[in-house]
Amino acid sequence: MIFQGGLGEFKFEMVKALVMTGFGLNCDLETSYALEVAGAEVERVHLNSLISSEKSLTPYRIFVIGGGFSWGDDHGAGVIMAMRLKHRLQDQIAAFVDTGGIVIGICNGFQVLVNLGLLPGFQWGEMKREVALIANDCGGFRDQWVTLSVNPASHCVLSRDIRSIELPIRHGEGKFFAEPGVIEKLIGRQQVFLRYAKPDGSPALAEFPFNPNGSVEDIAGICDLTGRVAGLMPHPEAFNHFTNHPDWTFFKEKYKREGKPIPEEGEGIKFFRNAVGYFE
């Protein structure tokens, strides 16, 4: 993008983001929209285009694997997609992160990242699978809105200046599980950036439906040690407009009575603004 100014022409480079598509990923349109609202130049790219080298991660700063049901969750949610990435794109993804890129996994994308071993990333370069997202304790698929608390001590780039947020979840395999020693590491290293909470912001303490899946320690999202690789089960891209919230009519009237402006953006956009803003 070229601008004219008093000192002549100058070029402003927008932050480029790649949203991966294909094989059952189905949240790419709303994810792309959220990134565009946040100020990124977005391209939706099929996995096969990356594998065939028709496209590369090199020109991009943000790489998103969004929600969906890749390969129909066969063999477990995110397993086959992770294997495809591991055998064909592992070195490229590692180089992308090593040179400062941001990787975001949302819902199915989070499942992919933990199966790939990119998260939790205790030892850079190992890509070792140390955590899992398994079947919900309730025994079925959950589609609901949840309250989330954000860890202010986390170094995750997505959660900067956010303390609590409401977002939708929709998954059948979202229970975060790991051995006690791994959980202790995650918490001690401030890699847990998002937890399920009660509406008043207090910890969910595994209570259903506030913790909708039985996640250990109410964990809803984690990042790696750099803070630039992050995964979460809730869908920030599904709260990209004020009217996405199930109680938007209540809040609209509330804001009117309080003399407050009615927002247009949904709060989920904050995560994407933080990702784009990291490079600005």
PLM features: what roles do these ranges have?
Residues 1-106, 110-128, 134-142, 216, ...:
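N-terminal beta1-alpha1 cap of cysteine-dependent amidohydrolase-like domains
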Residues 49, 53-55, 93-95, 128-280:
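Amide-donor transfer/coupling interface in amidating biosynthetic enzymes
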